[in-house]
Curated annotation (Swiss-Prot):
Name the record gives this protein: Glycerol-3-phosphate dehydrogenase [NAD(P)+]
Gene that this polypeptide is encoded by: gpsA
Keyword Membrane found: no
Single biological process term from Gene Ontology: carbohydrate metabolic process
Family under the similarity heading: Belongs to the NAD-dependent glycerol-3-phosphate dehydrogenase family.
Principal location: cytoplasm
Reaction(s) this enzyme catalyzes, per UniProt: sn-glycerol 3-phosphate + NAD(+) = dihydroxyacetone phosphate + NADH + H(+); sn-glycerol 3-phosphate + NADP(+) = dihydroxyacetone phosphate + NADPH + H(+)
Binding site for sn-glycerol 3-phosphate: K108, G137, S139, K192, D245, S255, R256, N257
Species this chain originates from: Burkholderia lata (strain ATCC 17760 / DSM 23089 / LMG 22485 / NCIMB 9086 / R18194 / 383)
Gene Ontology CC entries for this record: cytosol
Keyword Chaperone: no
InterPro entries given in the database record: 6-PGluconate_DH-like_C_sf, 6PGD_dom2, G3P_DH_NAD-dep, G3P_DH_NAD-dep_C, G3P_DH_NAD-dep_N, NAD(P)-bd_dom_sf
Alphabetical keyword list: Cytoplasm, Lipid biosynthesis, Lipid metabolism, NAD, NADP, Nucleotide-binding, Oxidoreductase, Phospholipid biosynthesis, Phospholipid metabolism
Pfam families: NAD_Gly3P_dh_C, NAD_Gly3P_dh_N
Length: 332
């Protein structure tokens, strides 16, 4: 199978390396210098340093060439751009006059200004594209790059997209499950990043494992309420792309969103934290969108509200936690 991966960040690079072990894979990035480095060293020293990439993996800064590769009869196009760059990439794909027939994306979050999920952006920008879906689940790019075991879910209303994604990814240490709840999978992937900031704050304040467990459990309730209101199915949120992804992101030391929370608890400013990270922390980008959507739907999301207060309203992390503890008692 031919596979084109659009986006050479940490996740796109790790997935491309996995795919190249079995398929004719091409990794695209618009940054010619990044592509030149990949070609010379077979390592993404900028985003995934220390991970050797397969010799068979090919690289290109020409979007047209990448799209042509992913548009072959027996091919798949994987969009690994962040949500913030998804619409721009769709524009470029359309302008190139070559939209692959089968597309799966791996980005997580809501578009900041429109509050749209990725599948809604795809539908608006590539209306002729119908065989598409989302690949998501509990996964750190570095561990995938190291060929450690991982389980992901592809959700699509297209059986052909599900089957093609399964054929591309389900090998080696990667197990793929299939489903059709695109909304539920996308909401889980977006909200868990915000909740991971909350658990990072609690851990950074030394509040203990009991507090972490409470935040994860009550955070899952927030995620599920929002997801069901937007059209997802409740059972999706107890699966890999809901609870599974939340546990990993809220507790794993490789989690950028958890790191943001830890550093906020240590008294660092958000600007300093993001500057030092050097990578995207999607929870920061989409926290306000999640809260705005919840309020528009009249859905109570107190943990998300507390995170937004710390990130954007100058509320001290300890005061935000105290506010959660002062909430009225209620039935679970």
């Amino acid at each position: 199978m031919k596979v084109a991966v659009l986006g050479a960040g940490a996740w796109g690079t790790a997935l491309a390396g996995h795919l190249a072990a079995r398929h004719d894979t091409l990794l695209w990035a618009r940054d010619a210098a990044l592509i030149a480095g990949l070609q010379a060293r077979h390592e993404n020293s900028r985003y995934l340093d220390g991970i050797a990439l397969p010799d068979a993996l090919r690289y290109d800064a020409d979007l047209g060439a990448a799209l042509a590769h992913g548009a072959a009869d027996d091919a798949l196009c994987v969009i690994a751009a962040p949500v913030a760059g998804l619409r721009t990439l769709c524009h470029a794909m359309r302008d190139a006059g070559c939209v692959p027939a089968h597309v799966v994306w791996v980005c997580k979050g809501f578009e900041a200004d429109t509050h749209l999920l990725p599948h809604q952006v795809i539908a608006a920008e590539l209306p002729e594209q119908h065989s598409n879906g989302v690949l998501s689940g509990p996964s750190f790019a570095r561990e995938v790059g190291q060929s450690l075991p991982v389980a992901l879910t592809v959700a699509s209303t297209s059986a052909e997209c599900r089957e093609r994604t399964l054929a591309a990814f389900h090998h080696g240490a990667m197990r793929i499950y299939t489903g059709d709840d695109v909304v539920g999978v996308e909401v889980g992937g977006a909200v868990k990043n915000v909740l991971a900031i909350a658990t990072g704050i609690a851990d950074g304040l030394g509040l203990g494992l009991n507090a972490r467990a409470a935040l994860i459990t009550r955070g899952l309730a927030e995620m599920s309420r929002l997801g069901v209101a937007l059209g997802g199915r409740a059972e999706t949120f107890t699966g890999l792309t809901g609870l599974g992804d939340l546990i990993l992101t809220a507790t794993g030391d490789l989690s950028r969103n958890r790191t943001v929370g830890l550093q906020l608890a240590a008294g660092r400013t958000l600007n300093d934290i993001l500057g030092a990270l050097g990578h995207v922390a999607e929870g920061v980008r989409c926290a306000q969108a999640v809260l705005a959507i919840a309020r528009a739907q009249s859905i109570e999301m107190p943990i998300t509200e507390a995170v937004c207060g710390v990130l954007f309203d100058g509320i001290a992390p300890r005061d935000a936690v105290s506010g959660l503890l002062r909430r009225d008692a209620r039935a679970e």
